[in-house]
């Protein structure tokens, strides 16, 4: 197993241009596919999850051209649904942002489509989405365990009508349903059951759908109305914002050991909810400065917070490791959906924080972290989860440094993360 030793860092300073957002990249690729016309996507994220989406689209007959560095994609839209005369089997790795939307999109056309992935993908639920698609006439068959991939779609199109979908586990199910609703055979009324988690990710979806010419009537996130007869039309060019979750590590670095760290590609005009991570750092005592497309973090003594972070679940992980440098006990609440991500992030985070000496209480949907008087060095297991590796890079700011096991798992969203992280030191 590969290991990366991060020696103690005294101070950080510098500027980082954040790579494209995973959430926006895969949504935009699918909408561009369904749209009429040619779309040029710039600042596309070059990572495993996006490669799985691109490979699947190519297999389904979508034509696109990538720049040499894979960050510009010119894609020829199908001007409608995806169909295939021959049976197709698509491997989607552990990419939830490809599995869920493609599962929904492939019900719209004609053909037989089987979706598979890595072993962890077979533990990541998709039942709430499939239940909703079945209400609209979709034929979806589970191949192993009910409610989980792999699965086969026997597509004949999607009917309109009223549909209920659970909102309390993952916003990706609602996102997938919203994106395909305009291409159903009639108007679609989506009723959300339970409290909707990660609302800002739904805002990303609605903003991108609007960019491609589709109107959704949002009734306070409890009901969504999509009138029949709409179609996606390419806006020509789509700029993919920097990934706000990825920005969180560099902003936390500035808050803990600044110096001054500036991240570009996200700012006050961002459509991503995870930029609100900077507000949490500010509550902890960091000095934060906002621009339209940048955020600056400067360091100071941090103090603990007790907050509901359901709206920023990915970025909230960074608060868990930043808490080791804060005075007092930090509590991160309403984060049950950490448990169904790339790994069970609540259990993994608690285990690894204890390794470095923290006192941790792991609840069903919360975590309490009290930092130790002295942080211990340790070998951090990353569970093939990119965010675990990046979060625990913050331990380089302890006097003892840290060792990260399997650091290359960051390739899921940020292949050169540790190179960028090293550029801030000094």
UniProtKB/Swiss-Prot annotation:
One GO cellular component term noted in the UniProt record for this chain: cytoplasm
One record GO biological process: aromatic amino acid family biosynthetic process
CDD domains with a match to the protein in the record: EPSP_synthase
PROSITE patterns assigned: EPSP_SYNTHASE_1, EPSP_SYNTHASE_2
Coiled coil: none
Active-site residues from the entry: 314
Primary location recorded for the protein, binned into one broad class: cytoplasm
Enzyme class of the recorded protein, top EC level: transferase
Residue numbers binding 3-phosphoshikimate: 22-23, 27, 170-172, 198, 314, 337, 341
Localisation per UniProt entry: Cytoplasm
Recorded superkingdom: Bacteria
Keywords, comma-separated and alphabetical: Amino-acid biosynthesis, Aromatic amino acid biosynthesis, Cytoplasm, Transferase
Binding site for phosphoenolpyruvate: 22, 96, 124, 172, 345, 387, 412
Gene3D superfamilies, per the entry: Enolpyruvate transferase domain (3.65.10.10)
A Pfam family per the record: EPSP_synthase
Annotated EC: 2.5.1.19
Molecular-function annotations in GO: 3-phosphoshikimate 1-carboxyvinyltransferase activity
Catalysed reaction equations from the record: 3-phosphoshikimate + phosphoenolpyruvate = 5-O-(1-carboxyvinyl)-3-phosphoshikimate + phosphate
Protein's pathway: Metabolic intermediate biosynthesis; chorismate biosynthesis; chorismate from D-erythrose 4-phosphate and phosphoenolpyruvate: step 6/7
Oligomer and partners: Monomer.
Functional summary from the UniProt entry: Catalyzes the transfer of the enolpyruvyl moiety of phosphoenolpyruvate (PEP) to the 5-hydroxyl of shikimate-3-phosphate (S3P) to produce enolpyruvyl shikimate-3-phosphate and inorganic phosphate.
Family: Belongs to the EPSP synthase family.
Protein name: 3-phosphoshikimate 1-carboxyvinyltransferase
């Amino acid at each position: 197993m590969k290991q990366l030793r991060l020696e103690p860092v005294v101070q950080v300073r510098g500027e980082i241009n954040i790579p494209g957002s995973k959430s926006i990249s895969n949504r935009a690729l699918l909408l561009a596919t369904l749209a009429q016309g040619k779309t040029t996507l710039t600042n596309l994220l070059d990572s495993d999850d996006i490669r799985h989406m691109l490979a699947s689209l190519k297999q389904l007959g979508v034509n696109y051209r990538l720049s040499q560095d894979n960050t510009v994609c010119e894609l020829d839209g199908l001007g409608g649904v995806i169909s295939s005369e021959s049976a197709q089997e698509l491997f989607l790795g552990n990419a939830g942002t490809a599995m869920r939307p493609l599962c929904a999109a492939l019900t719209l056309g004609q053909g037989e489509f089987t979706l598979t992935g890595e072993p962890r993908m077979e533990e990541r639920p998709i039942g709430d989405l499939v239940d909703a698609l079945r209400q609209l006439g979709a034929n979806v068959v589970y191949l192993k365990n009910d409610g989980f991939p792999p699965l086969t779609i026997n597509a004949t199109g999607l009917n309109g009508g009223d549909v209920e979908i659970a909102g309390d586990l993952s916003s990706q199910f609602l996102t997938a349903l919203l994106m395909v609703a305009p291409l159903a055979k009639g108007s679609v009324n989506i009723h959300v059951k339970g409290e909707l988690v990660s609302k800002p990710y739904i805002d990303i979806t609605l903003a991108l759908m609007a960019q491609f010419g589709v109107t959704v009537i949002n009734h306070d996130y409890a009901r969504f109305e999509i009138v029949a007869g709409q179609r996606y039309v390419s806006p020509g060019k789509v700029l993919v914002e920097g990934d706000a979750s990825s920005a969180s590590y560099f902003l936390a670095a500035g808050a803990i050991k600044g110096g001054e760290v500036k991240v570009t590609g996200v700012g006050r005009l961002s459509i991503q909810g995870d930029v609100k991570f900077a507000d949490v750092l500010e509550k902890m005592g960091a000095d934060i400065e906002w621009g339209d497309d940048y955020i600056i973090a400067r360091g100071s003594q941090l103090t603990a917070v007790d907050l509901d972070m359901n709206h920023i679940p990915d970025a909230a992980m960074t608060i868990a490791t930043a808490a080791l440098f804060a005075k007092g006990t930090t509590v991160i609440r309403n984060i049950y959906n950490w448990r169904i991500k790339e790994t069970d992030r609540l259990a993994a985070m608690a285990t690894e924080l204890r390794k470095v000496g923290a006192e941790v209480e792991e609840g069903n949907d919360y975590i309490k972290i009290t930092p130790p008087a002295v942080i211990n060095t340790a070998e951090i297991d990353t569970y093939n989860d990119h965010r675990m590796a990046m979060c625990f890079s913050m331990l380089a700011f302890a006097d003892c440094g840290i060792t990260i096991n399997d650091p290359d798992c960051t390739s899921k969203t940020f292949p050169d993360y540790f190179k960028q992280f090293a550029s801030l030191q000094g």
